[in-house]
C-alpha cells in the first residue's frame, strides 16, 4: 500500500517579507503534489502537509535555502491514504492564534524536556501537568493525571491561566501539546505572567509517541491530529476514528451508536446546532461522497481542486477585463 509522508513543521522567526513568500511556496507545493496547509505570518511559519518522500524532500530543501526559514523544526509520520485534499498557503496575523500581544517565544520560552525525560518530570508530585490542547482533542487521549482546561480554542487558554493558575502556588508547571508549537506560546505566556519553572515536552505528544516504547509510556488513549488520519497512537500508528463532516470533530464507534448520529450530517457533539438548510446541504454532500466512492473517485481531490482554481482564475480574469473596459 502506498505510503504518504506527513510533515508537521514550524519556526518562530521575524518574517517581514512573509507576504512575498506565499507565491513561490505555493508554486513549489503544487509542482510537487504537496497537499495540506501552511501558514505564514510576521512571526514565522506553521503547518502540516503530506506528499511522497520526494515531494516532502523538495519542500524541506526549499525551506533550508530560504535564509529566514533555515532550521525550521519538522516532524514526520506516515499515512496510508492522502490525509489532505487541498493545497493552501495562507497569510495570517499569528501562526498559532493565542490572541495576546507581545508574546515572543524567540526571546522568552519554557524549558524543553526530551521525551525520554518527560515521565520523570510529570511523575513529580510537585509538578502541575497541563494539557494545552482543546477539549475535543483531550477526549481522545492525554497524559496520566494531566489537567484539562476544557477550552474550545487556544484563544481561551490565557483566560484559563488567569482563573486557575497562580505563580505563588504552582511553582512548577509542565505543559504539552500535539507537536510543540502551542507550548512555545503557552510557556512564553506563563513566563511573562511570573511563573518561574515552566517546562514543555519537546516535539510534543507526537515525538513522545514516536520515541517512548508503549510499555514505558504514561500516555493514555490516542492523539488527535489535524488531518485525515484523525488520530494516532504509539509508534504513530493510525487509530480507528473518523471525522464528522458537519462539525469536523472526531467521532468514535460509541458516537455512531447514538440516535443523534447521521453519517456526514450530525454527531452527538453538533446535533441540534445546524439549520435545516445546512442539514440538507450536508445530506447532499454525503450523497455525492458516496456516489464518488462507487465510481472510485475522490469527492474533493486534485482534479476537483484544479477545476475550482481554474474557475476562480477565469472569474478574476473576467473582473479584470470588466475593469479595463470601464477605464
Swiss-Prot record:
**SMART domains (alphabetical):** RHOD (SM00450)
The Rhodanese domain extends over 123-217
Name a biological process GO annotation: tRNA modification
Presence of keyword Protein biosynthesis: no
InterPro entries per the record?
Answer: Rhodanese-like_dom, Rhodanese-like_dom_sf, TrhO, TRHO_N
Q: What would be an example GO MF term here?
A: oxidoreductase activity, acting on paired donors, with incorporation or reduction of molecular oxygen
- EC number assigned by the record: 1.14.-.-
According to its UniProt entry, the function of this protein is described as:
Catalyzes oxygen-dependent 5-hydroxyuridine (ho5U) modification at position 34 in tRNAs.
Family assignment?
Belongs to the TrhO family.
Name the record gives this protein:
tRNA uridine(34) hydroxylase
What organism is listed for this UniProt entry?
Vibrio cholerae serotype O1 (strain ATCC 39315 / El Tor Inaba N16961)
